[in-house]
Amino acid sequence: MAENALPKGYEPRDVEERWRRHWEDNRTFTPDMDAPGEPYSIVIPPPNVTGALHIGHALNHVLIDVLCRNARQQGKKVLWLPGTDHAGIATQNVVERALAKEGLSRHDLGREAFIERVWQWKEEYGNRILNQIRMLGDSVDWTRERFTMDEGLSKAVRKVFVDLYNGGYIYRGNYIINWCNRCHTALADDEVDHMPEQGHLYHVRYDFEDGSGSVVIATTRPETIMADTGVCVHPEDERYAGLIGKKILVPVIGRAVPLFADTYVDREFGTGALKVTPCHDPNDWTLGERHGLAFIQCIDEDGNMTAEAGPYAGLTKEECRKRIVADLEASGQLVRVEELNHSVGHCYRCKTVVEPHMSEQWFVASTKLAPRARAAVPQMTQIFPESWMKTYFNWLDNIRDWCISRQIWWGHRIPAWTCGKCGKLIVSEQDPTACPDCGCTDLTQDPDVLDTWFSSALWPFSTMGWPDKTKDLATFYPTSVLVTGFDILFFWVARMMMLGMHFMDEVPFKHVYLHALVRDGEGRKMSKSTGNVIDPLAMIDKYGTDSLRFTLAAFAAMGRDIKLSEDRIEGYRHFVNKVWNAARFSLMNLPEEAPAALDLDNVKGMHHKWILHRLEELKASQAAGIDGYRFNEVAQGLYRFWWNEFCDWYLELIKPDMQAGGERQATAQYVLWTVLREALLLLHPFMPFVTAEVWQALPGHAGDDIATKLYPAARPGCRDVKDAEHMELVQATISAVRTIRAELNIAPSYRLTTLVRPASAEDAATLEEGREMLMTLARLDGLTVAVDVEAPKASASSVVAGNEVIVPLTGAVDFEAELARLDKELGKIEKDFVQVNKKLANESFVSKAPADVVAKERARAEELSDAKAKLEALQQRFRDAIGK
């Protein structure tokens, strides 16, 4: 028996902590830059410093870790680079809330003191998520940990901004932007969450200035009427033929504005006449520019009405809406109000309704950068699943310039200064001391900071030392693959593509794998309000990390959301225990030292040949599956091999070998040792902790670290399909006897006699070769394999690949007792069957009960019908056996 026997039960907490510490202390995952091997690199999607580990993070990190550990096994030079994002708006909001508890605001502190306070918060709490990530067993290189506001990354951000500005790719100008009244900052288009809301469509009468009539306009935002500077209709709309060019009066304030035509107008919406409010709608802004309209702002940055709102100045926009609707109704200009379901934009951070707002902002000319990013897919970068390519192309084809300035204090401050004397704008990597034109030293830096996604878009190369020409950049850029959620395809992936192509002249990653969402077991989105959130840390504490990891991988089918429930995680905890117990059994049957090597290509014993064949199939399918990002298929293949083939079959088959001694035992020990260690290597990327613990307990592996070992080499000589087919016939025959035993309620301890009428001479020889296995695992007292066997009247039979398996029942079954038992069971089933059918025959139940309840009853009826048919067939078999 091997000395390094494992404890009876697997305790994940102690094992995991020990291996985490071992890997980090020994810098196991820091790549040796001088070692041979193809580079393989992945940058972590940087979590927010404000964040806590959620199940989506866990999925993302498990999949990346599988890829990285697998790549190391292939002998590649692997870098998985970790880090965090400063998360401008989110972090500032957290610190502002903390200040509010002290009765302070950021303005009370001032900019410098507030930023210092944020840094203090970051140092105290910002590493929380990284410590939580450590719990997952991520094989990252912690020596290369980065933060988006590190000195080196900040240097890269400034250089990119200045280079883009000097190249005409960044500009400043007035435009309609998305404005959050709560966060007091601009938002990019993809930072706006559009949610359905129940609202109203107000039909308002606008009178012509000359008193000749009126036009009815439909709007969802009557509070912006005071900023109207035109009314637009479609040039081919016959309802307004002859009216184009007339002056029309804006209700309440009486401003005369033009009625003009533009093909932008949808003739089918509302009345076909559109109020144009350039300062409060991006499409109206475009119309205003195109037709030379005035630009008037009636809602300010706080969501209050400006002086331009006339009698409503000072009101909130919500109060203004109520007042103006009442006033329009009183004046007779409110024609009617309709209920309307429409999409309303909300801030992705605080969920406040977003206000279109005219403001001077900084923009990246994305329209200039997009073409190269588009052309790179799929020639240089492949997206998995391929279905997301169309979405990627559509977004880039319809891209708008990216608003990158944010009116907050925490973040990369825009490197632009204005001269107080001559007004010159100075954009510089270094802080200027004087104006280059007039020499004035009174320089004011732009107060805004850059959108968080701006620095994140540089992550693949800024983290490796760019703009310096570092060894990391030369070795690991472009990265091998990006694994991330589909929800940030536009926020992050496309922008990394644009800036990577522009500054590195190469794509940032060769592959992009977009995983789906993790939902609850019923397919619902997880949310705190629903109470269905699965906390990964709680699951790790309860079931161990390997259980959670394997569950997520096993359900990570490409392009399909994951339905996750705690019972599934618990189920894979049983799998971890199965691996542990299989290892314990193996160690009890292995010598203290590594067993003597054998030529496995010529090993004797069909069960040995079979398990080696299945192991070779697993190696090949796993390598192809991971390369194709089919994580679920690989995980399910591992599960089948370990649970069904290795544990349920092979370990049972070798028990007689281990008792036999001599060459037979030595052969079994070497095959067992080989299969166990190679199966551990295959399982390791998915379950790093339990495999590491078992590995170092194997004979010949004391002190070894499985994380540094290579993928098991292929053995072409063990891929003979015939060997596997022979064993599978023996297995199927054993299963057939076991099924008959279970169906007929024959005690497991009772040894049966079995007759087999073989389909061919080859099958007969195979069954004879497997006689000992058949006798042992099917618990037989006798076995006859012959073409002329006769089935006794009282017998049960089954056909396996053309071979008839016959089990005589006399003495094995008490027919009278079994018939009585079956009568009793059938009576209960028939009673339940009548009740269910009665319920389904009730039209009131079928029409009024919830659909899932009706479906459940129908499934129950089908289940009872099947059970009834099986019991009746069994009953008839017993009657035939005794001539009843």
From Swiss-Prot:
Catalytic activity: tRNA(Val) + L-valine + ATP = L-valyl-tRNA(Val) + AMP + diphosphate
Pfam family, one: Val_tRNA-synt_C
GO cellular component term of the entry, any: cytosol
Keyword presence, Ligase: yes
Keywords: Aminoacyl-tRNA synthetase, ATP-binding, Coiled coil, Cytoplasm, Ligase, Nucleotide-binding, Protein biosynthesis
Cellular location(s): Cytoplasm
EC number from the UniProt entry: 6.1.1.9
Subunit field text: Monomer.
UniProt cross-references to HAMAP family, sorted A to Z: Val_tRNA_synth_type1
Protein's name in the database: Valine--tRNA ligase
Lineage: Bacteria, Pseudomonadati, Thermodesulfobacteriota, Desulfovibrionia, Desulfovibrionales
The gene coding this protein: valS
